[in-house]
Amino acid sequence: MAREMVAPFHEAQAWVEPEPKARQSIVARGLSKWFGSEQVLDDVSFSIAEGESLVLLGPSGSGKSTTLRLIAGLETPDSGEISLRGRRIEHLRARQRNVGVIFQNYALFPRMTVAENIGFGLRIRKWKKKKRGEVVNRLLGLIGLQDQRDKFPSQISGGQQQRVAIARALAYEPELLLFDESFSALDPQTRTGLRREIRALLRKLGIPALFITHDQEEAMEMGDHIAILNRGRLEQLGTPDEVYNDPQTEFVATFLGAANVVEGCWREGFIALDCEQCLRAPRPMTSKIATDRIKMIFRPEDVTLGGPTGLVETPHHLGRGEVIDVSFTGATESLTIKLLPRGYTGQLPNLHCGAGSDKPCNLMIKAVRTKWEAKKLRLAPGSAVSVGLRSYKIL
C-alpha cells in the first residue's frame, strides 16, 4: 500500500459537546464466557475512568475480541456484570447500550457517500433531516473532510476511511467507543500519525475508549492503562510504565517487549544463577527460603556493557561475556551476549561464589545500546565484554 499523507484533525471547537452526564467509569466484573466446552474468558474484571483509554493486549486466542463483543452487546457473558455510568447493560441489546464500535474493516457502506455514512446511525434513529445535517457538518469539520463529503469510500484513502468510521460512531454521542484493531490495515506512517490524533481527540471530547490490539507499540501509545490477557485470564492491569517496568508474570515480561529470563535459586540475600553466577538481591525477599527457585528478568536495555579489562558502572555485575551477534536497527544496536564461565569473573565486585569454575555457561542474553553507546565502544562478534545490569526483577 502506498504511503499517504494524513492531515491533522481540525480543532474540536466545531464540536458541540452533549450535556454533562454522570461521570462514572465503565466497570466489568467477573466476566466469563464459554463457547461449547471451551472457556474463552475466565473471571476478567477491569474498569475505565471517564475520559480515559484502556487497551486490551494479548496474543491470538487470548480473549480480547470476545471481551469487546461482550461490552458491545454482540455476545452475552455466561457470568459477570457490565456497568456503563452506573447502568447495568449486560442484558441489553447492542443498540440499547449507546456504545460506538469502530471495526477493523471500518464497515462503511460502499454505495453511500462520506456524509451519508456519517449520518446513517442518526437516520436509523429517526433524527430529523435538518438536525442530522447539522451534526454531519460539524463532524466533517472535526475530522477535516469537508471537501470529501460527496465521495464514496472507494474514492478516499484508508486513513480517511478510518476518520469517517470514527465520525459515524461519534454522531449519536456514544458513552463509550470500542476500537477493534482499527489501525491494522493502515501503512506504518499513516497508522502512527492517526493514533496520536485519535488519542488527542478522545481526550478533548472526554469519551472513554476501549482498544483491542496485539500491537505492543500501539498499546503503549494509546492506553492510559493496559490489560494483558492470556488464555482468557487477566495477567496484569496497570499503566504502560507499570506493566513494562514492573511485570508481575513471566508472560507479561516476555510478551510486552523483549526480556531476558534467567533461572536460579535464592540464597540468604543472594541470587545464585544456574550459570554459576551470584548477585546480591535487589531488596529483601522475606517470602523466599533458601531452596526456592526464582526467575530473574531484565530488559535488553537494562544490560550495560564495558570493555574486557574494565568494569561497567553499575551496582549489579553479571560477569564477563562474548559477543555472539550484532545487528544495527537504526536508532539502536542489538547484541547477543554469551556469558563466560565463572572462572573469568572471580575478581568482579558483587560476585560472591568464591573460586572459578570449569562448568560451562551456556546462557545467552540480549542487549540493546543506543547508537551513541555503540560509537563509544565498538563491538563485533567475538569481542569480550564485561556485563552489568542497571536493574532487574525477581519472580
Which residues does each PLM region occupy?
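Non-catalytic connector elements of ABC transporters
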Residues: 2-9, 13-14, 270-395
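Helix-to-loop junction immediately C-terminal to a conserved catalytic motif
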Residues: 72
